[in-house]
């Protein structure tokens, strides 16, 4: 079967590899669509990062580069392994793409996403969504309704990142949120917030991203910091108080500074983006306003609720898909476009079976 294989920085190859074995306790999936994630781009431009370098196998998967890529994917079950009796051939599914140790508890209230040596399918080994087929442990396979188109279903994984950020924020219906940055995660986070009855203000410089936020209906207000004083505008929109929650989705220090100043006293500020460099923060403002600054990473028992929001029609993922491509065009039409034209491309999805 065809698969996209990461060898090293700038070296991703489309190769023929053996089909996976559907072992006991696993589910065989024909991949329908797989999204290209910002993490994939970082691996391509700067890696290996999450991907274990050649000769240095991951302690759980036992694999190192080359590995099959892709962790945002949907598909159709073609086989189930021995012991799997609650999923049937032909069901539509998405995958929560974790690689964790078998003895880590994954029930409600656990923090399995923070466990030692955690990694992701499509990065740390165990196959990937940028291939025709994959076999995944039953625990990480989530059935979805046939009402959700499989191309949109590929966005449930990044949507779950947004949902986990929402959970971490403690936001509730009627609150006002400020989202710094309208990239893919910022937009999907905003979609979750709107679905939960929260008023959303987005701050963004890019015209294309502002347009996408407007077209998708995920923002009540969109502020361009090159045109207005964001903090002053937020105060006007909140009767002088500031926002209840804020989300940093850019890895840009000026945005972080703006969010701190736009928060009301006792607000929660969630850092969503992955920073590759140190940040500074006005600690005096944090202290004097008793702000609660929180991190968030990936997701943890978020997929069920995220799937429900989409199935019930509270979130429409179609507006966020900006291009559909074949696996053979992964680098030339996928990675290269996202690297050089990332403002206009929200989510490019790949069909490995075309």
Curated annotation (Swiss-Prot):
Residues reported to bind Zn(2+): 37, 71, 157
Q: Using the record's annotation, list all stretches that form the Enoyl reductase (ER) domain.
A: 10-350
pH profile: Optimum pH is 9.5-11.5 for the oxidation of either (R,R)-butane-2,3-diol or meso-butane-2,3-diol and around 6.5 for the reduction of (3R/3S)-acetoin.
Its activity depends on temperature as follows: Optimum temperature is at least 50 degrees Celsius for the oxidation reaction and around 45 degrees Celsius for the reduction of (3R/3S)-acetoin.
Name of the featured protein: (R,R)-butanediol dehydrogenase
Which E.C. number(s) belong to this protein?
1.1.1.4
Reactions catalysed, semicolon-separated, are: (R,R)-butane-2,3-diol + NAD(+) = (R)-acetoin + NADH + H(+); (S)-acetoin + NAD(+) = diacetyl + NADH + H(+)
The EC category is oxidoreductase
Q: What does this protein do?
A: NAD-dependent butanediol dehydrogenase which catalyzes the oxidation of (R,R)-butane-2,3-diol to (3R)-acetoin and of meso-butane-2,3-diol to (3S)-acetoin. Preferentially oxidizes (R,R)-butane-2,3-diol, with a catalytic efficiency approximately fourfold higher than with meso-butane-2,3-diol. Shows a very low activity with (S,S)-butane-2,3-diol. Can also catalyze the reduction of (3R/3S)-acetoin and diacetyl in the presence of NADH.
**Which SUPFAM superfamilies does UniProt cross-reference here?**
GroES-like, NAD(P)-binding Rossmann-fold domains
Q: Which UniProt keywords apply?
A: Metal-binding, NAD, Oxidoreductase, Zinc
Q: Do you know which InterPro entries this protein is assigned to?
A: ADH-like_C, ADH-like_N, ADH_Zn_CS, GroES-like_sf, NAD(P)-bd_dom_sf, PKS_ER
């Amino acid at each position: 079967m065809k698969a996209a294989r990461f060898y090293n920085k700038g070296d991703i190859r489309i190769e023929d590899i053996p089909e996976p074995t559907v072992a006991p306790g696993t589910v065989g999936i024909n991949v329908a669509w797989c999204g290209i994630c910002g993490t994939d781009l970082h691996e391509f431009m700067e890696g290996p990062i999450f991907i274990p370098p050649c000769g240095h196998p991951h302690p759980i998967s036992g694999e190192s580069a080359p590995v099959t890529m892709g962790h945002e994917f949907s598909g159709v079950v073609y086989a189930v392994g021995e012991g799997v009796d609650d999923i049937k051939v032909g069901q539509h599914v998405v995958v929560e793409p974790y690689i964790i140790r078998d003895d880590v508890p994954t029930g409600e209230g656990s923090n399995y996403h923070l466990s030692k040596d955690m990694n992701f399918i499509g990065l740390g080994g165990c196959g990937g969504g940028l291939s025709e087929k994959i076999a995944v442990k039953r625990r990480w396979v989530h059935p979805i309704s046939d009402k959700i188109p499989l191309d949109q279903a590929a966005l449930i994984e990044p949507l779950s990142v947004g949902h986990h950020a929402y959970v971490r924020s403690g936001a509730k219906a009627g609150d006002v949120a400020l989202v710094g940055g309208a990239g893919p995660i910022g937009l999907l986070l905003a979609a979750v917030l709107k679905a939960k009855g929260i008023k959303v203000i987005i701050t963004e410089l890019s015209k294309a991203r502002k347009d996408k936020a407007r077209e998708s209906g995920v923002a009540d207000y969109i502020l361009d910091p090159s045109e207005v004083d964001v903090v002053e505008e937020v105060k006007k929109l909140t009767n002088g108080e500031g926002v209840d929650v804020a989300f940093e989705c850019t890895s840009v220090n000026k945005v972080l500074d703006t969010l701190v100043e736009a928060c009301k006293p006792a607000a929660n500020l969630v850092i969503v983006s992955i920073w590759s460099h140190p940040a500074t923060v006005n600690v005096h403002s944090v202290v004097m306003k008793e702000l609660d600054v929180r991190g968030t990473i990936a997701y943890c028992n978020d997929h069920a609720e995220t799937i429900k929001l989409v199935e019930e029609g509270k979130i429409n993922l179609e507006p966020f898909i900006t291009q559909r491509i074949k696996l053979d065009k992964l680098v030339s039409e996928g990675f290269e476009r996202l690297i050089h034209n990332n403002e206009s491309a929200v989510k490019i999805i790949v069909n490995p079976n075309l």
